[in-house]
Regions:
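Ordered alpha/beta subdomains of enzyme catalytic regions
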Residues: 1-240, 245-246, 355-397
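Glycine-rich phosphate/ribose-binding loops and adjacent secondary-structure elements
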Residues: 2, 211-397
Length: 397
């Protein structure tokens, strides 16, 4: 099988912004990530060996001068010394342990220094998706002209509806080539004439560079999941907001607030932090309900919600985005990040429903290990040690 990931920055922007944050705040932290397949897929026999081959290839993937030049130009909030670090960074396949049982289920654990292991999430997920679609014949049946036409039609619908819209589809993309095709179609449509909507770019740093787009992304849930073990569930959001703003001095101002549900976050959101951050990201729960809660919280702090960004990203399709946009009706600065519906909406191909989540951590190599969990604004939806999830839910009430 050919090598799938050949570019160092074929990765989401938040990987880099979180990595630098970790280097600044928790440079000695060690973690464990776990692969979760929500579809409980039975992968073809030998899939683990093919995936291991892709993992081994990653040892030779290094950042280029061109990539460094692009990132230093676009990501001015990252210091130059960080790119010196990236020049020396090497993917370490020994951090990844892959197993496949007799039924075909995959088990993947990633363990090591947090600042190092964070780089694996996106390459592993996108490799799994592309390998599976290749092995089950989806790639062989791919109709390029048809898929390009679908991407054009979808783009026209998006921008015609006035949506502020970006791609977040690297992790579960059909293939590398298909994500590139979709982004080229979106850019072509957007550049063809003035539209009510706006194309904000892509979370994929490589494609942003190659296609002349804006790289998008700020942070991920893992920062809050880790912090809960440092400062507790009721203070972790505030402390991540404070530390993240310390690191980036007000840049990267979209906060992902739902890691332990909305009440924990809103009850501890100060006016200072609400003003420091340009907006919030809605990644779970009912979008209309969450919008009303966000608006009410901003108003209670004396802040005009219409000046604040709200990024919606909870498994959306275009029709859902349009419905949310109509509901917002200018009351917030709404925008949309869509993944699978953009990069894996292929006829007769079932998208993967896979994630890699932080499940254990310790603040230094000499401290004890703790379980990391993630709740959400979706009732009953939890990730991680279920006993701890139940305990934290009992505290939240």
């Amino acid at each position: 099988m050919r090598q799938i990931i050949t570019h160092f920055t074929d990765n989401d922007l938040y990987t880099f912004s979180c990595q630098y944050y970790i280097m600044q705040k928790y440079p000695r932290a060690e973690v464990e990530y776990t692969f979760i397949d929500r579809n409980k897929t039975c992968y073809p026999k030998g899939f683990d060996k093919l995936l291991q081959e892709q993992i081994d290839y990653m040892a030779g993937v290094t950042i280029t001068d061109q990539e460094v030049e692009f990132m230093t130009e676009k990501l001015v909030w990252l210091p130059l010394w960080y790119f010196t670090f990236l020049r020396g960074y090497r993917f370490n396949p020994n951090e990844v342990d892959i197993n496949q049982d007799e039924e075909g289920h995959l088990s993947i654990l990633i363990r090591g220094k947090w600042f190092s292991t964070i780089m694996w999430e996106m390459p592993i997920l996108s490799c799994i998706s592309e390998l599976l679609h290749t092995l089950n014949g989806d790639v062989a049946n791919y109709n390029l002209e048809k898929e390009y036409a679908k991407a054009v039609a979808k783009s026209e619908k998006i921008f015609g509806a006035g949506l502020v819209f970006g791609d977040m589809g690297t992790r579960r993309r059909f293939t590398y080539d298909h994500q590139k095709l979709v982004l080229k179609a979106m850019k072509h449509v957007y550049d063809s004439k003035p539209w009510p909507g706006r194309f904000t770019g892509t979370s994929n740093v490589w494609f942003a560079m190659e296609l002349g787009l804006t790289p998008l992304g700020t942070m991920s849930h893992q920062l809050i999941s880790f912090e809960e073990n440092v400062s507790g569930v009721f203070e972790c959001n505030y402390n991540v907001m404070r530390k993240f703003s310390d690191v980036y001095d007000g840049n990267n101002g979209i906060y992902l607030y739902d890691c332990f549900g909305d009440s924990v976050f809103f009850n501890n959101l100060s006016k200072r932090m609400a003003m420091m951050y340009s907006g919030l990201r809605v990644d779970s729960g009912d979008e209309e309900e969450q919008t009303e809660k966000i608006i009410a919280k901003y108003k209670s702090l004396g802040i005009n919600p219409a000046t604040k960004q709200v990024v919606y990203s909870n498994g959306l399709d275009v029709d859902k985005c349009i419905a949310i946009h109509k509901f917002c009706n200018g009351r917030v600065l709404d925008s949309y990040g869509v993944g699978t519906h953009i990069t894996c909406d292929i006829d007769n191909a079932k998208p993967s429903n896979i994630v890699i989540k932080l499940t254990k951590c310790r603040i230094t190599e000499v401290r004890e290990w703790h379980d990391c969990i993630k709740l959400s604004c979706d009732k009953g939806k939890t990730l991680g040690n279920q006993e701890k999830c139940k305990y934290i839910l009992s505290l939240i009430g």
